[in-house]
């Protein structure tokens, strides 16, 4: 009752991410985003043509893709390309939709193309038999701000119960789930942020920004005297 939508996604910064048209040798570097169908419900994407891939596509690992407007124009010189094909990670992908470009100012959703999550090889791997996977971000949308604490408690309770079934490893959420703004400060998945140190750092930056104009102003006053 405290969850409106949930989605998962991750970017691949390690692979050789190039695409090509089936009938051409020229390749282009791209920034792929691997996602499940829930991502379309959590975040707002503006579809220019076509539609997003479905959860059935994700579960089956079908080679379908949503392209950004810019990438569609780079590859096909048009955005009216639903149903056309291109080659990526050794597979022939069919274009199912085109979305308006997503700004890099929102890196959690930005990409040149979005493809089904289970096509990412790291997602399908397990760790020491405990079925633990990493490098996938889960995004949850609560109906109201008042539901967030209840949703956070429910997630933590699910992991507590899951840990009762594991024999060797224990999952530690490190105080997650975070509010979205807090998640931008989480740089290491293996430890919780030190909010005290982060706050001190921000205060030092603020004081420095205030001190520099003060120095400039005092210099102007001295020169006039």
Language-model features: where?
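Mid-to-C-terminal secondary-structure elements
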Residues: 36-52, 63-193
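Hydrophobic alpha-helical transmembrane segments of multi-pass inner-membrane transport and secretion
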Residues: 191-225
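Glycine-centered tight turns that cap/initiate beta-strands
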Residues: 2-5, 80
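Short, function-defining helix-loop hinge/capping sites that tune catalysis or transport
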Residues: 44, 58, 76, 221-224
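Short acidic/polar micro-motifs at solvent-exposed secondary-structure junctions
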Residues: 4-38, 52-65, 103, 180-184
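Short hydrophobic/aromatic segments of transmembrane alpha-helices and their interfaces
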Residues: 23, 55, 130-132, 184-185, ...
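Membrane-helix interface segments
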Residues: 26, 146-147, 197-200
């Amino acid at each position: 009752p405290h969850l409106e939508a949930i989605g998962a996604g991750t970017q691949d910064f390690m692979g050789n991410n190039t695409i090509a048209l089936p009938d051409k040798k020229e390749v282009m570097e791209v920034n792929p985003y691997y996602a499940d169908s829930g991502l379309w419900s959590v975040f707002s994407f503006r579809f220019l043509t076509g539609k997003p891939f479905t959860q059935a596509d994700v579960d089956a690992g079908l080679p379908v893709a949503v392209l950004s407007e810019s990438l569609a124009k780079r590859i096909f010189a048009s955005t009216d390309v639903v149903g056309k094909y291109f080659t990526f990670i050794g597979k022939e992908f069919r274009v199912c939709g085109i979305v308006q470009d997503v700004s890099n100012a929102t890196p959690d959703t930005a990409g040149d193309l979005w493809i089904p999550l289970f096509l990412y090889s790291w997602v399908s791997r397990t760790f020491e038999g405990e079925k633990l996977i990493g490098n996938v971000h889960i995004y949850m949308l609560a109906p109201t701000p008042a539901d967030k604490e209840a949703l956070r408690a429910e997630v933590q309770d699910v992991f507590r119960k899951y840990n009762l079934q594991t024999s060797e490893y224990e999952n530690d959420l490190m105080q997650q789930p975070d509010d979205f703004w807090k998640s931008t400060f989480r740089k290491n998945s293996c430890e919780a942020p030190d909010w005290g140190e982060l706050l001190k750092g921000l205060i030092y930056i603020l004081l420095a920004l205030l001190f520099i104009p003060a120095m400039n102003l005092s210099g102007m006053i001295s020169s006039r005297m």
